[in-house]
Amino acid sequence: MARNREGLVLVLDVGPAMRSVLPDVEKACSMLLQKKLIYNKYDEVGIVVFGTEETGNELAREIGGYENVTVLRNIRVVDELAAEHVKQLPRGTVAGDFLDALIVGMDMLIKMYGNAHKGKKRMCLITNAACPTKDPFEGTKDDQVSTIAMKMAAEGIKMESIVMRSNLSGDAHERVIEENDHLLTLFSSNAIAKTVNVDSPLSLLGSLKTRRVAPVTLFRGDLEINPTMKIKVWVYKKVAEERLPTLKMYSDKAPPTDKFAKHEVKVDYDYKVTAESTEVIAPEERIKGFRYGPQVIPISPDQIETLKFKTDKGMKLLGFTEASNILRHYYMKDVNIVVPDPSKEKSVLAVSAIAREMKETNKVAIVRCVWRNGQGNVVVGVLTPNVSERDDTPDSFYFNVLPFAEDVREFPFPSFNKLPSSWKPDEQQQAVADNLVKMLDLAPSAEEEVLKPDLTPNPVLQRFYEYLELKSKSTDATLPPMDGTFKRLMEQDPELSSNNKSIMDTFRGSFEVKENPKLKKASKRLLRDKPSGSDDEDNRMITYDAKENKIDIVGDANPIQDFEAMISRRDKTDWTEKAITQMKNLIMKLVENCTDEGDKALECVLALRKGCVLEQEPKQFNEFLNHLFKLCQERNLSHLLEHFMSKKITLIPKSEAADSDIVDENAGDFIVKQESMLES
C-alpha cells in the first residue's frame, strides 16, 4: 500500500437487533465509499459482517471458532462494486459477537499489510452493542480486549466504534449494554480508538468520517513571548469548510480508441488593442492599472513586488485582554489549533502553564502571525486556551483571525432599548416567546443534543455525491427527490411541530401581522383623533419597503407620505435628518400662511412627532414644538393654538425616547402651561 493510501475494514453488525436501522447503515457506508471513489480512489476496502447464520472467514477455516462472522469482501482497491455490496447487506438471524468480528478484521489487515504503513490501517465498527459477547477460553473479557487493543496499537491499526441504539429496553439489555460499553472504553484506553454514540440516521451519517484528511502543519516555529522567551509550537487547521470537488473542463475530441487520452481543455488568452485588431500584445508589453478617481494609475510588476509587505515568519504575542472584549462576530476565517512541539518537554509545560492561567483569569491572547517567510500579508488573531481533560493530550490554544478596521461592517439601526414601552413586547408576548424557544430547544437537559456539528453532515455535499454516483451509471439520470434523512436538516422536525401546535398558535396569535395602510392611503385617513403617546396599535412600530420608498423631498401634495418614506430609507445615514428638517420647514410655511383651522399643519406635526419617536430624535421635536407655540403666540394665531391644544400634543418624554430631557410629568405640564397662557 502506498504511503498516502488507507486500508479500511468495515465491521458491520447485521443481527436481528440491527434490522430496523440497517437501511441507514447501508446508506452511510455507501456514501463513505462514494467519497473514496472521488477523493481517495486508490484506497483499499474490506467488508466484514457479523450476526449471519452462516460463517465465512479465514480464521474459522484455519483454527475454528469465530462463528457467524462473514467476510463479504476481501481488502482491495475501492470500486463501484464495493458501493453496491454495502447497499445489499445480508439480514442476519443470530446475535453476533463484535469481538470475534474485530479479530477477523484485524487479522485481514495484518495479513494484507504486515507491520508496515502504521496509521494508514483502520477498522470501523458499526453496531448497537446490545448482544452478549462470548467468554474467552482463558482469563476475563477485560483481559481479552486489552490483548486485542495492544495488538492493534503494535500494528498501527486505528479503530472507530459507532454505537447506534434506539428502542432498547429490559434488564437483560441494560446489563449487556453496560458490559459492552465498558469493553469499548477499554479499546480507547489501550489503542488508537474512539467510540461515538448516535441515536438517529442523521447523526449516523455524520459520525462516519467519510473523507480522510492528513494533518499538515500550517506553521512550525516560535511563539515569541518576548525577544528572550520563545516557545516552539505547531499550528494545524482545526475547522475548515469542506467544498464541492473541483469540476474540470472535459474535451471529447480525442479518438474513442485512444486509451491514454487525458481529455484536457487548455485555454489561452490573446490581448489586443481593439477587438478588430490582428496584432497581439506581448506579455512584457502589458501592465496592470488601478483606478484612482477618474484616472487609471499604471503599476509595473516590479513596483507591485516592492510594495509587498515582507517579513520573517513567526508568532508574536502582543498582549492579553479579557475574553469578553473579543466578540464572536469578530472571528473571520477557519479555526486553527496551536499545540506545543511534542518533542520539546519545556514547550509543553510552558504552553500548559500559560493556557491554564488564561483560563483561570478568563483572558485571551492577541498575537501577530506570519505563517511563511516572504508572505505578503500579516494577520492579527486571538488565542483562546484549550485545557485538555486527558492525561495523554497536551494543553493547546485555538486561533482565530481578527478583523482590521477596514474589515468591520457597520450598519446604523435604531436601538431597541430606546423604543417606547408601547413598542416593546408585553409580559404575555414575552411569555409565549419564551415557550417557543423552549419548545425548539435542540439540547434539552434530559436528552442528547440534536444537530451536533460533529455529527451533522452537509446536505449539499451529500446530494452532490449521490447525484454523481447516478450519473456514473447513466448520463441521462435525473436528480432524485431529497432523502428524508436530510430533510431534517433543511426543515423543522414535523413531529416536534405537531406535538406543540398549541404553542405555535399562541405565538402566532400574540404577534398578529396586519397590513400597514400608511403607505397606501391618503394621509388624512391615516391619523386618528387621539392623544399623542397613546398605546393604541396605530402607535406601533411602522415598517417600510425600502425598494418602494425612493422619495428624497417632502412635497406639498403628500407631505406625510413623503416624510415617512424618507425616514424609512437606509441607503444613507442622513435621510432622517433631511426628512425632519424639511418637515419642520413645511410646518412653519403652513402656519405662516394659515387661513383656516390648520388641519394640514396639525397632521404634519403629529407625523413629525411619531417620526422623531421612531428615530429617537426627541430633542429636535421638543425644541421645534416650543418654537412653534411661541410663533403662534407672537402672531396671535389663537385659533391654531386652540386646535393644537384640542389634540393634546405633548413633548416627547423619556418613556418614549431615552435621549429625551423631559420626564413624563413635565410633558403633561406643557399642555397645561400653554392652555393657561392662551386663557390669559
From Swiss-Prot:
PANTHER family: KU AUTOANTIGEN DNA HELICASE, X-RAY REPAIR CROSS-COMPLEMENTING PROTEIN 5
Disruption phenotype: No visible phenotype when grown under normal conditions. Hypersensitivity to ionising radiation (IR) and to DNA-damaging agents. Longer telomeres. Defective in T-DNA integration.
Coiled-coil residue windows: none
GO biological processes: DNA integration; DNA recombination; DNA repair; double-strand break repair; double-strand break repair via nonhomologous end joining; response to heat; telomere maintenance
GO MF annotations in UniProt: ATP binding; ATP hydrolysis activity; damaged DNA binding; DNA helicase activity; double-stranded DNA binding; telomeric DNA binding
Alphabetical keyword list: ATP-binding, Cytoplasm, DNA damage, DNA recombination, DNA repair, DNA-binding, Helicase, Hydrolase, Nucleotide-binding, Nucleus
CDD domains: KU80 (cd00873)
Transmembrane segments: none
Reaction equations catalysed: ATP + H2O = ADP + phosphate + H(+)
Subcellular location: Nucleus; Cytoplasm
Induction behaviour: Up-regulated in response to induction of double-strand breaks. Down-regulated by heat shock.
Similarity remark: Belongs to the ku80 family.
Domain of life: Eukaryota
InterPro entries linked to this entry: Ku70/Ku80_beta-barrel_dom (IPR006164), Ku80 (IPR024193), Ku_C (IPR005160), Ku_C_sf (IPR036494), Ku_N (IPR005161), Ku_PK_bind (IPR014893), SPOC-like_C_dom_sf (IPR016194), vWFA_dom_sf (IPR036465)
Lineage per the UniProt record: Eukaryota, Viridiplantae, Streptophyta, Embryophyta, Tracheophyta
Tissue specificity as recorded in UniProt: Expressed ubiquitously.
Quaternary assembly: Heterodimer with KU70. Interacts with WEX.
Name listed for the protein in its UniProt record: ATP-dependent DNA helicase 2 subunit KU80
Ranges for domain Ku: 224-432
Gene Ontology CC terms, in alphabetical order: cytoplasm; Ku70:Ku80 complex
E.C. number: 3.6.4.12
General function of this protein: Single-stranded DNA-dependent ATP-dependent helicase. Involved in DNA non-homologous end joining (NHEJ) required for double-strand break repair. When associated with KU70, binds to double-stranded telomeric and non-telomeric DNA sequences, but not to single-stranded DNA. Plays a role in maintaining telomere length. Acts as a negative regulator of telomerase. Binds to and recombines double-stranded T-DNA molecules.
Any one Pfam family match given in the protein's UniProt record, by short name: Ku_N
